[in-house]
Design a protein with these regions (language model features):
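Loop-to-helix junctions at membrane interfaces in multi-pass transport proteins
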Residues: 1-4, 78-218
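Helix-loop-helix module between adjacent transmembrane segments
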Residues: 1-64, 134-139, 225-234
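Membrane-interface helix-boundary signature
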Residues: 9-12, 46, 50, 72, ...
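Hydrophobic residues within alpha-helical transmembrane segments
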Residues: 18, 52-55, 74-78, 166-170
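Transmembrane alpha-helix boundary and packing residues in multipass membrane permease domains
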Residues: 29-32, 36, 89, 147, ...
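Re-entrant/interfacial helical elements at transmembrane boundaries that shape
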Residues: 236-238
Length: 238
């Protein structure tokens, strides 16, 4: 509706509506992440985990609409930032590994030399600088993140929108560094996450369970779940 009114074009309105159907795949990915969190942290089976994730999401989105989405995303986003800072610090400290960060790098190199280099030819995600650029571009705020658009368009002034873009870029960079937690998880668990029946998506929750008391791991897990829910509700509203 915003783009159609902005450019006074029914074609633009219709085209964006049709393209928005692709968001169902993005939403499905977020729900799967929620399933993983509930499976690991609460021991639920996949069906119950998916049902709970979906019901909680729909409950506050249906009752509150875009307003509920914006308010809850503000709270969830704060939790995500705290979690991101925690993961970055833990990784840079090489937490729980004798020798700290340098021992962490040595550990990864001993498992596979490609894990300690900028490029990893054995994976399609990081086999070239071009693939890394594409991944970075896909995560640029307001580039390919439609769930942020409704927050931007809810602002009245151009100044507020510009401020939003700056903050989104900064926070987006910090949240992207959550991937550093994968390095620490690989040092702890090795190839176990790639064994038959295992799921690499469980890396962060398993890492928290390994290095923290149960109550603290559960609390941190809420931060991970916040990332899932804040993205999913934004996609539903979009």
């Amino acid at each position: 509706e915003y783009l159609g009114d902005r450019y006074q074009s029914e074609f633009m309105r219709l085209a964006v509506s049709l393209l928005s159907l692709v968001l169902f795949f993005y939403l499905a990915g977020q729900l799967v992440s929620g399933v993983v969190m509930f499976e690991i942290m609460l021991g639920l089976n996949a069906e119950w985990a998916l049902g709970i994730t979906t019901l909680v999401l729909l409950f506050y989105v249906v009752l509150g609409g875009a307003h509920a989405d914006i308010l809850t995303d503000g709270f969830q986003g704060a939790l995500m930032l705290v979690l991101a800072v925690l993961v970055i610090v833990l990784t840079l400290m090489g937490y729980g590994i004798d020798g700290g960060l340098f021992a962490l790098v040595d550990n990864l190199e001993a498992q596979d030399p490609n894990l300690a280099t900028a490029l990893n030819p054995s994976t399609p995600l990081y086999h070239s600088w071009w693939s890394i650029f594409v991944i970075a571009f896909a995560h640029m705020p307001l580039g390919l993140l439609p769930h942020l658009g409704n927050k931007l368009w809810a602002l009245d002034s151009t100044q507020d929108r510009f401020q939003f873009v700056k903050l989104a870029a900064l926070f987006g960079l910090m949240l992207g560094m959550l991937g550093l937690g994968g390095l620490l998880a690989r040092a702890y668990f090795g190839d176990a996450l790639y064994a038959e029946g295992a799921n690499p998506n469980q890396a962060l929750p398993l890492l928290f369970i390994e290095i923290f008391p149960t109550w603290l791991a559960a609390l941190i897990g809420i931060g991970v779940l916040s990332a899932v829910m804040s993205t999913a509700d934004g996609l539903v509203v979009s």
